[in-house]
Amino acid sequence: MTITHNLGFPRIGAQRELKRAVEAYWAGKQTADELLATGRALRAAHWRRQADSGLRFVPVGDFAWYDHILEWTTLLGAVPARFAQPETQAVSLDTLFRMGRGRAPSGKPAAACEMTKWFDTNYHYIVPELVPGQTYRIAREDLFEQVREAQALGYAVKPVIPGPLTWLYLGKGDAFQQGASDEDKLKLLANLLPVYQQVLKRLADQGVEWVQIDEPILALDLPAAWRDAFGLAYAQLAGSPVKVLLATYFDGLKDNLSTVTKLPVAGLHVDLVRAPEQLDDVVEALHADQVLSAGVINGRNVWRTDLDQALRKLEPVARQLGDRLWLAPSCSLLHVPVDLLAETELDAELKSWLSFASQKLDELSLLGRALDGDSSQAVQEGLAAQRAALAARRSSPRIHNPAVGRRMAASEQVSRDRAPFAERIRQQQARLNLPPFPTTTIGSFPQTAEIRGLRRDWKSGALSDSTYEALIRKEIEAVIRFQEKVGLDVLVHGEPERNDMVEYFGELLAGFAFTKNGWVQSYGSRCVKPPIIFGDVARPAPMTVGWSSYAQSLTDKPVKGMLTGPVTILQWSFVRDDQPREATCRQLALALRDEVLDLEKAGVKVIQIDEPAIREGLPLRRADWQAYLDWAVDCFRLSTAGVADDTQIHTHMCYSEFNDIIESIAAMDADVITIETSRSNMELLKAFEDFHYPNDIGPGVYDIHSPNVPDVDWMVGLMQKAGANLSKERLWVNPDCGLKTRAWPETEAALISMVQAARTLRQATS
């Protein structure tokens, strides 16, 4: 009988129960015991759902209060010195939260650890901080307690832990200047591996048979030293009394396959959604007693699986491997919403095309039964339902828009060229008259409960359109007056009408669909509800012009029009899988171009097109980068094609480590780029040491993801550090991201300090 299992389940709960509990605890509205009880209840519900679907094992260790990498970092006791962790005491939950967000109900506030994207997904992990000679110990008991929880409920468990090489590769430290693959990090294995051995021994003592060790860096281009380190590390772990399932995902093993096949592990999981072509090579390379876990259900998108195609692919493998073939999703289901049954307002046709985490478990079970030759009525009806849904989707008239097809065919003839930057910036400065070190914010201002209530009441029909518009205009005016009072130079309207920087636009574009409970975790307690792009994209009417032109009418200072860029909308949506992603992105660019030109006609002098996701779209293998960058840059330029030279185009990128793609960033030719640099202490500016970035740049001077108010001198120091590599005439002063998640008191204090920092810089250079 084919074993089915899961690499990980969404931890947030179908109704975001974890988010609400954690935030209530942070706010002092819930005790630690109440928070822990919520965690236990969620884990029990998730294990029950997975077991009910027929999984042989339930995963344990996929639950996290903030982030699974942070959980593992604290288990290892790798707590940075500024958090004052006693060496002999367990790491507390509050210390974990302070590492993630800078503060917690107990303990002194401190600078939060850096946060960055998890491979090429929209999930963020907390970066481990590494120092030479770092020592490790088992400093948290959560993993072992959760194993006991699941066993007490009667489940066979498969603990899931990050692999030692992946954990080190993802870590950073001042001593490791060569980046992720710095070979000096491998010296830490000597202290790290004994703790892994202790963990595996303790799990074995708890009766655990299989442990899943995630090593997703095996989908990357790895230097020889790192490939060699896999052999040394897993040889040392081979003496552990548990069976190891080595899990890889997000791409194929490719040149790392020869490394993996030499490892003394009992099983191997591979992603056959991202890299279906690797199946034959992996099967051929397996040892005679090794298990192959085939990741055939897409863990990163929401479309139903073609089970007939999967069966055709797997049947010869099943005949060859027998019970050594396991089935699983391609990766953790962390990246998809919890349950389609929670969607009561999606139309039946579209809903029939979809599959969320819970439904993917059912698909997995159905596939396993069919592969085992189960010809029962239930299996046959299940397969027939899959076929019918796929056929209906392919033939639906909702998918293709002939007008979009015609625009796509003509888009190659649209000129992307503008005058040289030196000429543009001269015209823009004459029009805008900005001081040195101009100040601005990234776009959003605090989203209060009142603002969220306005949107909710309007959508439910409790507020009329006219009343809603009047109230939103009042919020916009308040934000404009606040910015004038603080002394900012380029203003924003605050985006009170927007629930999310992608969902807002998707609701106004054709080809998009929306869920009510399709939440996925982005970072910590922050969840996002990605739109679903199911068909051709078009803009039926202006989306932002009314709000932006109203905001500009309130002040003589320039107010930025705010748009989300085509690549980011693509990256942060669930994208149709029936055409290349490039084609969908180009459709988005054409729709946004219409909006840009309408904003310009309405008198908006500065237009920001956010592209925070530009780097996360990079393929994991460098050989595939240029093809992606070519179309991503072209789509950005297509979205701004035709604007006047005195209209200033901004773009924003947050948590984008783009040092290695700086030439492509420059090729986007935005007049001003604002980037996240505060958490990384201006590390992202290393790219400018060797590359003379030609246009204006605003390196973020404070971390908006932390509630701590920045110090003026600290921000001045960051800008002086930036000025060592960049022309001071080209520098802007801004936060590193939008202010949506912050409260008003800390926002006001932070922006007052930021404006003072800019004034200090002007005085120092005058």
UniProtKB/Swiss-Prot annotation:
L-methionine binds at I442, G443, S444, E495, D610. It is an enzyme of class 2 (transferase). L-homocysteine binds at I442, G443, S444, E495, D610. Keywords: Amino-acid biosynthesis, Metal-binding, Methionine biosynthesis, Methyltransferase, Repeat, Transferase, Zinc. Pathway: Amino-acid biosynthesis; L-methionine biosynthesis via de novo pathway; L-methionine from L-homocysteine (MetE route): step 1/1. GO terms for biological process: methionine biosynthetic process; methylation. Binds 1 zinc ion per subunit. The active site is at H705 (proton donor). 5-methyltetrahydropteroyltri-L-glutamate binds at R16, E17, L18, K19, K117, R526, C527, W572, E616. Pfam families: Meth_synt_1, Meth_synt_2. Its cofactor is Zn(2+). Zn(2+) binds at H652, C654, E676, C737. InterPro entries: Cbl-indep_Met_Synth_N, Cobalamin-indep_Met_synthase, Met_Synth_C/arc, UROD/MetE-like_sf. HAMAP family: Meth_synth (MF_00172). This is 5-methyltetrahydropteroyltriglutamate--homocysteine methyltransferase.
